[in-house]
């Protein structure tokens, strides 16, 4: 097990997560006692206790007073905040994980973008106008793209969509920095933002669904061509 962590707490967290992932601590089983586990990992019990509480909040474990700590099936108990961790744990599955992430983004954005443009056009236009001054490089576009989708999610009037985008942020922006290094991707995105702005101005809300689906398809084709050179830094860094 190769762990790159910058602190005892970070090391303990990665050790436990990787042990769960590799079935050293399988879902449904009980973690070793606190004293045994702290000695096994090489950290103080105080540090271990803090790590266990954090992992419980993220859905990896269930802690109940007076009972042993139980390992969860994280697919059933965790949230979007573990996406980057999953990317680090299973490099071979990263392309599929990213495909699933982008598919979810397209599917939900057809709903919240249409709602934003129809019910809150001024807010939607304010969000889309931020594309007018973006610098022509990958980092700027990655931040812009995330902020536009997130901004339109909140502009829809349903903050739950915004919270979903918040949960995607880490892996989403890492993907974006790689994807938007391609000038074709930046050009396609600008065209998409401009099209949405035009539809908003015209009140053509019925065209939003197809516009978003088309962008998802076209950007997906660019992304699939780029996957052969997928960088290793999509995984989260050690704490």
From Swiss-Prot:
GO terms for cellular component: cytoplasm. It is found in: Cytoplasm. InterPro entries: FA-response_TF_FadR, FadR_C, TF_FadR/GntR_C, Tscrpt_reg_HTH_GntR, WH-like_DNA-bd_sf, WH_DNA-bd_sf. Pfam families: FadR_C (PF07840), GntR (PF00392). CDD domains: WHTH_GntR. GO terms for biological process: fatty acid metabolic process; regulation of fatty acid metabolic process. Residues 6-74 form the HTH gntR-type domain. PROSITE patterns: HTH_GNTR. Homodimer. PANTHER family: FATTY ACID METABOLISM REGULATOR PROTEIN, TRANSCRIPTIONAL REGULATOR, GNTR FAMILY. Multifunctional regulator of fatty acid metabolism. This is Fatty acid metabolism regulator protein. It comes from Salmonella arizonae (strain ATCC BAA-731 / CDC346-86 / RSK2980).
């Amino acid at each position: 097990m190769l762990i790159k962590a910058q602190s005892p707490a970070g090391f303990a967290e990665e050790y436990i997560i990787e042990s769960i992932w590799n079935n050293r601590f399988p879902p449904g089983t009980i973690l070793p006692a606190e004293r045994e586990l702290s000695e096994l990992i090489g950290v103080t019990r105080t540090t271990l206790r803090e790590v266990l509480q954090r992992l419980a909040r993220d859905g990896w474990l269930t802690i109940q007073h007076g009972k042993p700590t139980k390992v969860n099936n994280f697919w059933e108990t965790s949230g979007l905040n573990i996406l980057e961790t999953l990317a680090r744990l299973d490099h071979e599955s990263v392309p599929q994980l990213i495909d699933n992430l982008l598919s979810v983004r397209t599917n939900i954005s057809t709903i919240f973008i249409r709602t934003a443009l129809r019910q809150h056009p001024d807010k939607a236009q304010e969000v889309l106008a931020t594309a007018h001054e973006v610098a022509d490089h990958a980092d700027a576009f990655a931040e812009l793209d995330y902020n536009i989708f997130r901004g339109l999610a909140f502009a829809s009037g349903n903050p739950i969509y915004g919270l979903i985008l918040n949960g995607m942020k880490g892996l989403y922006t890492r993907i974006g920095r790689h994807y938007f290094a391609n000038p074709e991707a930046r050009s396609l995105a600008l065209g998409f933002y401009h099209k949405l702005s035009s539809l908003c101005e015209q009140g053509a809300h019925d065209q939003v669904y197809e516009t978003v689906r088309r962008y998802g398809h076209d950007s997906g084709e660019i992304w699939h061509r780029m996957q052969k050179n997928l960088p290793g830094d999509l995984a989260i860094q050690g704490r």
